[in-house]
Amino acid sequence: MESTSPHQGSFYKSNLCSPDSPKDTVPKQPMSATLRERLRKTRRSFNAAFSVAKRLKVDCEENESSSDCPNNNLPPHEDSEPNATKIEVDLVSEGDICRLDSRTSSEASSPVRCKDHKQLLQEKKLLLKKLEEQEDTLRRLKMVKLYRAKNNLSELQSLIEKWRKSSQLSLYELQAALIAENNKVTLSQLIESYGLDENLLHYNRTEEDFQDQ
């Protein structure tokens, strides 16, 4: 069996656990001012009270070193913060003005709309009333037409004349019968007692006789 010396063991440990080996270490690169500015502006946009679109202002291009920037010694927020705040205030102010204008215009037009709505309701009521009147008139005309179709006016006139003559004869006979019984009764008294219409009977009260006779 081969024996290992203390120097060889320490050599193996140094090769396995040494932090200075080129495989385990990655050289750290310093963060540029441009990248820091981007991170700061991005963080401020997330924490802002209003979400507004901001344009990131970069003082130095990414391909240039920090020594080429003229304002590298100044704090990064002094150059861009006033502009960003101004843009945000301007955008919020314009939004408030637009909302105020739209609200004012809607409130101004609401009385006009209400007036137009009332006028339309009144016109609707008038049209419905006229429509009902026309429908009622049409219904009456249809009834008259139906009545005339079922009843012949000439036939009705002949029936009325027959009724008048028969009524007159009946009254004459009744008056003669009552006189025979020593009851003197006039035709006017008989017509009134039976509730007959003098105009239909063609009775003349002055002469106390029928006009057709």
From Swiss-Prot:
Subcellular location: Nucleus
Entries under PANTHER family matching the protein: SWI5-DEPENDENT RECOMBINATION DNA REPAIR PROTEIN 1 HOMOLOG (PTHR28643:SF1)
Bridged cysteine pairs (disulfide): none
Region of interest: Disordered: 1-40, 59-82
Family that this chain belongs to: Belongs to the SFR1/MEI5 family.
InterPro entries noted in UniProt: SFR1, SFR1/Mei5
GO CC term, one of those recorded: nucleus
Alphabetized Pfam families for the sequence: Mei5 (PF10376)
Primary role: Component of the swi5-sfr1 complex, a complex required for double-strand break repair via homologous recombination.
Subunit: Component of the swi5-sfr1 complex.
Residue ranges the record marks as coiled coil: 112-169
Species lineage: Eukaryota, Metazoa, Chordata, Craniata, Vertebrata
GO molecular function terms attached to this record: transcription coactivator activity
Keyword presence, Transcription: yes
Keyword Coiled coil attached: yes
Biased composition (Polar residues): 1-18
Keywords: Coiled coil, DNA damage, DNA repair, Nucleus, Transcription, Transcription regulation
Protein name: Swi5-dependent recombination DNA repair protein 1 homolog
Gene Ontology BP terms: double-strand break repair via homologous recombination; positive regulation of DNA-templated transcription
